[in-house]
Amino acid sequence: MIILSTNDNLTNPYEIARYIKEAKKSTPVRAYIQGNIEIEETEELEVYGCDNFKIVFGELEVVEKLLEINKDKIKHYRLEYDRRNSAIPLLDIKHLDARIEPGAIIRDKVKIGKNAVIMMGAVINIGAEIGENSMIDMNAVIGARGIIGKNVHVGAGAVIAGVLEPPSSVPVVLEDNVLVGANAVILEGVRVGHGAVVAAGSVVTEDVPPNTVVAGVPAKIVKIVDDKTREKTKLMEDLRG
């Protein structure tokens, strides 16, 4: 199994792809088993329960073998699983100093800054970084190695392209205080400058200068950020912390 260390260059799409290809694939399952069966806990099986009822955690092939061997002793069983041949585990979020809502999918090797907010249905891929006080809204996607600065809002359904497929050595970067509207798309390698605003539904194909507003398909500069724009796009601190 290939382990991607903290020293590996996650901006290299081919290194990430190699890691995914060579990683041991996992299909973890949870089995609820009713029957007169003795199950010994091993390195491959985690077992809970009493005489006639067991809850077993393990890889699919190991648990299925257990069920087949003991099929004459089992009255009922139920298998639950949520992935198949998964190459990258999900991030351990329990000690993050951030708000992670149910249904967010965050893969391993992701960095989440203090007081960040990850909403329901958001997807954050391997190697991405989310800065302090930034919000990734519902159903937004942050691709592999996407770099999100501090005090950024990525609107619902927005897509921040990753460095994988098509491969790109340069990640998307949203600098501090950027706002990306709902359903906007930021394509591979684009850098959005400090304080810029990307209008909802825009497709950004080129770098965005700081403190500008871009809109359209493809996105073009429509104005400079002014006091009225700042008022309309300001973040709500009560949603953070």
Curated annotation (Swiss-Prot):
UniProt keyword terms in alphabetical order: Acyltransferase, Amino-acid biosynthesis, Diaminopimelate biosynthesis, Lysine biosynthesis, Repeat, Transferase
Spans traversing the lipid bilayer = none
Q: Which domain of life is it from?
A: Bacteria
Which Pfam family is an annotated match for this chain, by its short name? DapH_N
What's the catalysed reaction? Answer: (S)-2,3,4,5-tetrahydrodipicolinate + acetyl-CoA + H2O = L-2-acetamido-6-oxoheptanedioate + CoA
Q: Give this protein's Gene Ontology molecular function annotations.
A: tetrahydrodipicolinate N-acetyltransferase activity
Q: What is its EC number?
A: 2.3.1.89
Q: Which GO terms describe its biological process?
A: diaminopimelate biosynthetic process; lysine biosynthetic process via diaminopimelate
Q: Which range is the signal sequence, renumbered to this chain? A: none
| Pathway(s) annotated for this protein in UniProt | Amino-acid biosynthesis; L-lysine biosynthesis via DAP pathway; LL-2,6-diaminopimelate from (S)-tetrahydrodipicolinate (acetylase route): step 1/3
Q: What does this protein do?
A: Catalyzes the transfer of an acetyl group from acetyl-CoA to tetrahydrodipicolinate.
Q: Which family does this protein fall into?
A: Belongs to the transferase hexapeptide repeat family. DapH subfamily.
Question: What is the official name of this protein in its record?
Answer: 2,3,4,5-tetrahydropyridine-2,6-dicarboxylate N-acetyltransferase
